[in-house]
Amino acid sequence: MGENEASLPNTSLQGKKMAYQKVHADQRAPGHSQYLDNDDLQATALDLEWDMEKELEESGFDQFQLDGAENQNLGHSETIDLNLDSIQPATSPKGRFQRLQEESDYITHYTRSAPKSNRCNFCHVLKILCTATILFIFGILIGYYVHTNCPSDAPSSGTVDPQLYQEILKTIQAEDIKKSFRNLVQLYKNEDDMEISKKIKTQWTSLGLEDVQFVNYSVLLDLPGPSPSTVTLSSSGQCFHPNGQPCSEEARKDSSQDLLYSYAAYSAKGTLKAEVIDVSYGMADDLKRIRKIKNVTNQIALLKLGKLPLLYKLSSLEKAGFGGVLLYIDPCDLPKTVNPSHDTFMVSLNPGGDPSTPGYPSVDESFRQSRSNLTSLLVQPISAPLVAKLISSPKARTKNEACSSLELPNNEIRVVSMQVQTVTKLKTVTNVVGFVMGLTSPDRYIIVGSHHHTAHSYNGQEWASSTAIITAFIRALMSKVKRGWRPDRTIVFCSWGGTAFGNIGSYEWGEDFKKVLQKNVVAYISLHSPIRGNSSLYPVASPSLQQLVVEKNNFNCTRRAQCPETNISSIQIQGDADYFINHLGVPIVQFAYEDIKTLEGPSFLSEARFSTRATKIEEMDPSFNLHETITKLSGEVILQIANEPVLPFNALDIALEVQNNLKGDQPNTHQLLAMALRLRESAELFQSDEMRPANDPKERAPIRIRMLNDILQDMEKSFLVKQAPPGFYRNILYHLDEKTSRFSILIEAWEHCKPLASNETLQEALSEVLNSINSAQVYFKAGLDVFKSVLDGKN
């Protein structure tokens, strides 16, 4: 195509020259020239005429004719003012050359007589016209036949049938999801995680998913030791297991898995005897208060889970000098869906990926660092009943009474001995990956992620919900694909392994294919733990995708009798979306049902992983209608991102989110506010000048749409800071929780510098945010400049 276009100007010039020779020859024909009588010149003209005819056939008649038509009467307009009315049309064997009488050397003011061969030429032209007409009619018949016999399921690229998505999603049924869920739960009772991975691969392949395969990584896992951890009261010598039961052989047999799997993966190992100091939630104010009245060096902190990321709180305790942590969940914070009598749980202290290969994939011959633990603290999760025994307090919650929080008085001393024993081993983590290849943009990926059972850990039943939902959508999608339809962009389906130990499977896969994913991933749709309650739909989305989620949720509301108002936010979430948010800057969407109590309580309780019997999915959603709703909402978002010509991302919403994060009385933000205003202006200009015209089908030039989509998919990458506090997102567009509306790294820095007149940490955080906003503003401006230069080039 490029070569053809490049040759057009040369073809035009050559044609013009040859036409010049042709007319010259015609004027020299015997009996028709009043000026030239030389026989040699006449023979030369006839030779030139033959050469011109041959070259015309080689260069292409259509191109030549088009080019000639465009330049008609333009060739000498700069040098000669022609009296066109006085020029009679010349007649030549090829009438398209009559314009060349206007050449300055051949201007005549007489009427030429018709050549003798006119009748023959007329017959020749008539034959061409008849042939062209027959071919045209034949082409119409072929087109009609092909159109009527093509599958009606495949709409043309660039147009989206509004009923297409509903046709795919209507095949998703709650009963099918329930059946799949029960099969998975039953499978978990009898087989290990590798067998479950094989079942998932077999099922996805049978549904028609393309190139379904295992992607395995050998990683370092921190597994439970041969015997459960213990906590012993020094005053009485009583020994307790993490669930509060006295240490005994009988207790171990009755609940062996609960006892073993109630641990903190990647904690330090060993024994520590020290005083227990209640630090509540471990906030900055809590630690300042405690350190004023007690020496905390090498002591044991009694810490509540929630309000801030666990890794951040442990980092603060480690810096303060603590030696161990007894971690628990206040019964007053527990959602109704969790039975407080079974609140043993597991946590992972791994920020993500294989700890022995930080930042690079665990492939063959990779260098492995020696990191059996990720903290110097001995960390042990314990139940609320055990906490009550440690502080000599009655139970915190009774059936009909109000809840009272557990609290150890500061004037009382409790000394305990805690023993933590885990084992680190190299194990294989398996991901299952398959895809549906895109039709027009196969190199652009929408990744849909669920996770499957992980051995040696608490998994509850959330993994079965996650897997059943992604399988239900694959079944619905492939039924359409088998009838000839394909999405414009490639949809990649992933079932991650090792999620409980720190999203290891997704991190390793992301690090393995980082260069490809950085360039090609458009969005990530998370199906992690979709049913955590049954009272409220709780969507989480990147700022650029919130408008799309609102539209889909409102449409879903019109189909249901009850639909309470839904708050859509960009907050930190658990699960395998972590790598895509914090290392690739990819927009994400996640739908989940929550318990109202959970939403009202402290955030980050979801960092705890409860046992199977503590969370009963079928009790929360007996009809599986909630599962069906999550599948359809997620599916509709997937289809729209995968199939719309213009990505349904909103640039202006990012700028508005930045401005909202800077509202209120915040110190040292005047520069940030000024930069945020410039970002908004650039985003508004980009939205009005580029995005709105692109939504008009008449303006959808393929190269222009591709350029626009490339800009849209990389918008959030500007907001990845180099380093964030432990447990905080590197992507600063995400808040800590729904109760905060400011940049999380600024909140942490302000808390850190409260007692100080000036603080380097605050200045560094302000600089990070300023650079991110400036980078985004420059990015939008550069995008506008690219479009402008392309338009100027065309003009």
Swiss-Prot record:
Residues 1-121 are cytoplasmic. The gene maps to 3q26.31, a region associated with Cornelia de Lange syndrome. However, PubMed:15168106 failed to identify specific mutations in a panel of DNA samples from patients with Cornelia de Lange syndrome. InterPro entries: PA_dom_sf, Peptidase_M28, Peptidase_M28B, TFR-like_dimer_dom_sf. It is found in: Membrane. This is Inactive N-acetylated-alpha-linked acidic dipeptidase-like protein 2. The chain crosses the membrane at residues 122-142. Residues 143-795 are extracellular. Glycans are attached at residues 295, 373, 534, 759. One of its GO terms (cellular component) is nucleoplasm. It holds the Pfam family Peptidase_M28. Expressed at higher level in kidney and placenta. In embryo, it is mainly confined to duodenal and stomach endoderm, mesonephros, metanephros and pancreas. May be catalytically inactive. The lineage of its organism: Eukaryota, Metazoa, Chordata, Craniata, Vertebrata. It comes from the Eukaryota. Residues 1-38 are annotated as: Disordered. Gene3D superfamilies: 3.50.30.30, Transferrin receptor-like, dimerisation domain, Zn peptidases. One of its GO terms (biological process) is response to bacterium. It comes from Homo sapiens (Human). It is a single-pass type II membrane protein.
